[in-house]
Design a protein with these regions (language model features):
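Solvent-exposed polar/charged
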Residues: 25, 47, 63, 110-113
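Beta-loop-alpha module in the N-terminal Rossmann-like domain of NAD(P)-dependent dehydrogenases
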Residues: 40, 52-111
Length: 121
């Protein structure tokens, strides 16, 4: 039986470009979606990968059938984006510092506990 691949999406194609390239090249991982507000840059990048769906809206991106999300968006937005992704049923990796306040840290920990999803930084 073939091993199920981990389906990954990347949010933020500037700094996330490297993560997307690595995901696409890894055995056992499938790059399935990317999200960025810079539509042309995102579509140009996605054209290199067959079957990758592009989104400009984070909410719609999270509706995509994927197991995990790599957050490569603005560092100040990682905690809210991570919490939203976990509530949408996705595991999360932040490529940068996750929180800017203790309140965000507490909210992030609570989201991990409530959802049972894996969060990596």
């Amino acid at each position: 039986m073939a091993e199920k691949k981990v389906r990954v999406g990347v949010f933020g194609i500037g700094r996330g470009r490297m993560f997307a390239q690595q995901a696409a090249a890894m055995d056992g991982v499938e790059l399935v979606a990317i999200c960025d507000q810079r539509e042309k840059a995102m579509r140009d990048f996605a054209a290199q990968y067959a079957g990758v769906t592009t989104y400009t809206e984070y909410d719609r991106f999270l509706e995509h059938d994927m197991d995990a999300v790599v957050l490569a968006n603005y560092a100040t937005e990682h905690a809210p984006a991570a919490i939203q992704a976990m509530r949408a049923g996705k595991h999360v990796q932040s490529e940068n510092i996750a929180v800017k306040t203790m309140a965000e840290a507490v909210a992030l920990v609570r989201a991990v506990e409530a959802t049972g999803k894996i969060y990596m930084y």
